[in-house]
Amino acid sequence: MSAVSKTVDGLVLRLYIQPKASRDSIIGLHGDELKVAITAPPVDGQANAHLVKYLAKQFRVAKSQVVIEKGELGRHKQVKIIEPQQIPTEVAAVTD
C-alpha cells in the first residue's frame, strides 16, 4: 500500500508523525509513509487532536471528516480524509 490511496469517499493516508516539531508541516515521503511534523507533544491525546485539526485545515474539511483509523497510540497512523475539498501539493505529489 502506498502512502496515499484514493477511496470511494476520499483519501487514506499512511502517516509517520513527528511530535514536538518547531512548526506544523507535511514534510514528504518517509519510507512508504507520508511524514507530518506537528508542534503538539504526544501527551494525553494532544498530538492526535492537533493532527486532526491540522489535516482538516490542509484538506479544507470539518474535523469530523478526518478519522484516525489505525495507530491511535503510535507514530505510525492511518488516517482517512472524507471528501477532501483541497489536496495539499505534498500529498498530490505522492497520490497513486
UniProtKB/Swiss-Prot annotation:
A GO cellular component entry from the record: cytoplasm
Pfam families found in the cross-reference section: DUF167 (PF02594)
Gene3D superfamilies: YggU-like
SUPFAM superfamilies: YggU-like
Superkingdom, taxonomy of origin: Bacteria
InterPro entries registered for this protein in UniProt: DUF167, YggU-like_sf
Family the UniProt entry places it in: Belongs to the UPF0235 family.
PANTHER family to which the protein is assigned, alphabetical: UPF0235 PROTEIN C15ORF40
Name this polypeptide is given: UPF0235 protein ESA_00387
Organism the protein comes from: Cronobacter sakazakii (strain ATCC BAA-894) (Enterobacter sakazakii)
Lineage: Bacteria, Pseudomonadati, Pseudomonadota, Gammaproteobacteria, Enterobacterales
